[in-house]
Amino acid sequence: MADKLIIFDTTLRDGEQSPGASMTKEEKIRIAKQLERMKVDVIEAGFAASSNGDFDAIHTIAGMIKDSTICSLARANDKDIQRAADALKPADHFRIHTFIATSPLHMEKKLRMSPEQVLEQAKLAVRFARKFTNDVEFSPEDGSRSDMDFLCRVLEAVIAEGATTINIADTVGYGVPELYGNLVKTLRERIPNSDKAVFSVHCHNDLGMAVANSLAGVKIGGARQVECTINGLGERAGNTSLEEIVMAVRTRKDYFGLDLGIDTTQIVPASKLVSQITGFVVQPNKAVVGANAFAHASGIHQDGVLKARDTYEIMRAEDVGWTANKIVLGKLSGRNAFKQRLQELGISLDSESELNLAFQRFKELADRKAEIFDEDIIAIVTEESAEAQEKEHYKFVSLSQHSETGERPHARIVFSVEGKEVVGEANGNGPVDATLNAIETEVGSGSELLLYSVNAITTGTQAQGEVTVRLSKAGRIVNGVGTDPDIVAASAKAYISALNRLYAGADKLNPQRADI
């Protein structure tokens, strides 16, 4: 029987560290439920000591998720570890993931600790974590740039203290496949008690090699856990992509010889959910989940695929969750048909009132758009959830615009502030600029617009536009997403969504970063 590769997803922790990717508690819960449906082995739900918001999200997820192990990150100190244990209490089974830097650069410049102090701190941290659970993971931060002899000493010591998973972190994406794979291999060979722990890999994509390095850690090094995120989400250039790891190991089982517990048909739904919640659009040529991943433009390729799919396709689109039947509903579709499609898409709404509200939005969209696609339905539910969690301090009501060739466009927008309607009017260099200016005449947020992007959710001129707006204020960066067949209205909704996140803090109260 083949060994099993453990999939450890850190979308909710490391992925969320992408600038603008902060998620509300409700959004984290929706992603956690989707990860559970995908049968992810371990879900790192956050960093409990970083903020009250993260603690609350972890605590709630720990009580809801039953089929995946829930994990919280903690620095190598008693306060962080106690906070993680408290957040994880509702879980049937949980993991504490503690870490400390081990590279000379980090020990000297960041920690200002000697190697012996770091060694002792690592031992104490694992010993304390074992008081709460027998599932303890230890990561040597910046492990790929650490001294080999010292790294071996630290890892041997923490395994002796009870660490059951050892995670070799390529924190800055410095590794290359052969060297990183051999690093993991050497550690497993040199550490006398290495057989007492599962070795794990955690790679960043700064040089574009996160997936390659992770696979080398598995094949060459013998690692049996990969830490990854949906869509490769993460700060800087991102993290190891879950979908690429899973499909590489599944498609090339002849080479890797490993089993997986993942339901791969849930990969694309997870990708779309994370993209629409965070506003980080998946590039069309992204492996596995990109819109063009299974598209064939070459006539020779098309002819081959029509004759036999395996001539040019090494995996089937339906195996990762792409559906051939795109048009699902129209304005004559009833509530039961809508509810059934939600279930087929793996979308779970918590109450009848939420279902009724989503169905109302669906009917409103169907009156304006003849064909409703899966992506439209996901967008409806995602936007509904975001508005509910944002408490709608600001709420879009209506928009009118006037534009003639040679004249500056004028916009008039009606929106509510804590339930009281206000009207903003302004001119701009285009209809979108005029609309956002009109909002600011009443809000005066003082924020800076860092990003404005438009993406068509589906195909055709009737497609809904999905607009992502990224705002910065006082060091905080937030994303807002809005959808509407009218691009200008979608822009207004996205801007208001971002303002709500700035106002609410997006569940982040004095957050602290954690780099592994």
UniProtKB/Swiss-Prot annotation:
It catalyses: 3-methyl-2-oxobutanoate + acetyl-CoA + H2O = (2S)-2-isopropylmalate + CoA + H(+). One of its GO terms (cellular component) is cytosol. Its EC number is 2.3.3.13. One of its GO terms (biological process) is L-leucine biosynthetic process. Its cofactor is Mn(2+). The keyword Cytoplasm applies. Belongs to the alpha-IPM synthase/homocitrate synthase family. LeuA type 1 subfamily. This is 2-isopropylmalate synthase. It comes from Paraburkholderia phymatum (strain DSM 17167 / CIP 108236 / LMG 21445 / STM815) (Burkholderia phymatum). The gene is leuA.
